[in-house]
Amino acid sequence: MEQLLHYVWKHKLFPLTALCTTSGKPVEVIDPGLHNRNAGPDFFNAKVKIDGTLWVGNVEIHNKASDWYVHRHDKDERYDNVVLHVCGCVDTEAKNSKGEALTQMALDIPDKVMKNYRELLSVDQYPPCYQIIPSLTSLTVHAWMNALQTERLEQKTNAIEDRVRRCNGDWENAYFVTLARNFGFGVNGEAFEEWAFHIPLQAVGHHRDDILQIEAIFMGQAGLLELNTIPERYQKDALNDGYFAKLRNEYKYLAHKFNLTPMDYRQWRFLRLRPQNFPHIRISQLAHLYYQRKAGLSQLVEAASVEDAKKVLATAVTPYWETHYTFGSTSVRNDKNLSPFSLNLLCINTVVPILFAYGRHRGEEKYCDRAFDFLEQLRPENNYIIRLWQQCGLVVDNAGDSQALIQLKKEYCDKKECLRCRFGYEYLKL
């Protein structure tokens, strides 16, 4: 319940009874202070009047006063300027590292707040705060959605910056890894990222004019050129159709030339995947995109519009895959271009965060601004998360809105972080 005490203090949701210290002195909270989520006191620079005297300093909050000693704050000089120790239960006197007794105050959580909080944690329906959504003002909704959208973009930017570091500062390589991850479309995202780190782009660049060799390296590094990766019923046809053997021979030569080691093919997931999302198809599309030389980082960041970005990423498969989904398994001829739906998702999850991260890296606001513009222009995702929020009455106009709601579910609802959510704040005030 300590986090709930933090929440009550931060938002001044105090009980109707007057606040007072354990010695009976009246307390008036002028400013609860700045919430600190790192090491040190819980709230910085709070302003409280105690018995008519204004105190400015830090506030520490605990379930029980004795937690002060459990956390060894009595040995830590950073807590010497705590002007008020707020506790759910004051079960002992507390002293700082100088041996000085702290001013302490017992804070009760209002019954209404406690009731609403327990409801939020126990409701099985998603979102648990669905009852409050229709009554929220548009200002409250838009402010929180904008904050969530920025938070999600920052999160993706941090992931890209981590890839840049892993790629020794090579932004082109980090962009390729990011694009590859998003070609996994969720289910195979991690496998595609691992695969991309196994692709030596400098080596592949020497063979960029030969689509067969590009696809051989791409498929080989995915671990998909071993016979045992093909379902047994298709192995004979794969050996007879010639293409599998041709790729395997090319890869054998190139693997020796560049000292390549493939990833473990068992990382790929096929169960309940639509054939269009099979790794073979997505890898062939990436090979074709790389061969076309039109989807490099420079082309992407200079895309002036969403349509330009989609043209950069538009790709198909090599001819063999127009009639196959795996080696040896024939299908009706299909050009297997990236669908408009897939291009929309790639723009949301690759183009936008790359633009934002690259703009921040270069200190060029035009790229960051374009990232937000693209989010407003792109269609929203259509998945169960978005549909549930729409059923609650939220309007989802664009990809910025859908990204905000995905962030809300993953980082707040799923983690029961209602106390950090503005919708949760409104619910607790009911």
Language-model features, listed with the residues they occupy:
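N-terminal "leader" segments that precede or initiate the main folded domain
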Residues: 1-7
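N-terminal ordered "arm"
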Residues: 7-66, 79
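Catalytic micro-motifs at enzyme active sites that drive phosphoryl/nucleotidyl and oxygen chemistry
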Residues: 32-37, 45-50, 68-75, 90-96, ...
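Short Cys/His-based metal-binding microdomains
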Residues: 63-66, 75-82, 88-90
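Short loop/turn segments at secondary-structure transitions that flank enzyme active sites
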Residues: 65-67, 90-92, 111-113, 185, ...
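Compact, glycine/acidic-enriched structural inserts
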Residues: 82, 86-144
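Hydrophobic, aromatic-lined core segments that form the binding pocket/scaffold
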Residues: 149-404, 417
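Cysteine-cluster motifs in flexible loop/terminal segments that predominantly coordinate metals
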Residues: 403-430
